[in-house]
């Protein structure tokens, strides 16, 4: 098993709950896990896998004050790693996640697991999907 970084930004606690479930799934699969807010990230070079969590903000966009600048810093190091995405949204269909997946593809970042999204607070099914995501990238 490898070393996994679960990196997230959460405004209301919904994406944080998802991040905790991803970390729990990765640990249960035997991985060494660091659970980090985007403000704590110093790079991803020491990790085999990276799970990134961010809620939809504004008009279906990534949070641009802390998360997006951090993402732009680590993106060059993500190709070749196991990468997965997750997050929550309040309205619409979760289009921000589809845009984020397309952004990854444009930058040569292959996703190792299906992305997980939750409408507002994650329900039991979303939390189970987050645990499975964590296990899959471990």
Where are the predicted features?
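FMN-binding flavodoxin-like domain, especially the glycine-rich phosphate-binding loop
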Residues: 2-4, 14-17, 21-39, 46-138
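Aromatic-flanked redox-active Cys/Sec active sites in thiol-based oxidoreductases
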Residues: 8-12
């Amino acid at each position: 098993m490898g070393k996994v970084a679960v990196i997230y930004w959460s405004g209301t606690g919904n994406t944080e709950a998802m991040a905790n479930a991803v970390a729990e799934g990765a640990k249960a699969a035997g991985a060494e896990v660091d659970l980090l807010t985007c403000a704590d990230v110093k790079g991803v070079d020491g990790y085999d896998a990276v799970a990134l969590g961010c809620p939809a903000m504004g008009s279906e966009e990534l949070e641009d004050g802390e998360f997006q600048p951090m993402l732009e810093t680590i993106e060059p190091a993500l190709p070749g790693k196991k990468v997965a995405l997750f997050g929550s949204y309040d309205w619409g269909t979760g289009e921000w996640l589809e845009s984020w997946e397309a952004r990854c593809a444009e930058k040569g970042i292959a996703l190792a697991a299906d992305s997980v999204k939750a409408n507002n607070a994650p329900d039991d099914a979303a939390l189970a999907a987050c645990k499975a995501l964590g296990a899959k990238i471990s």
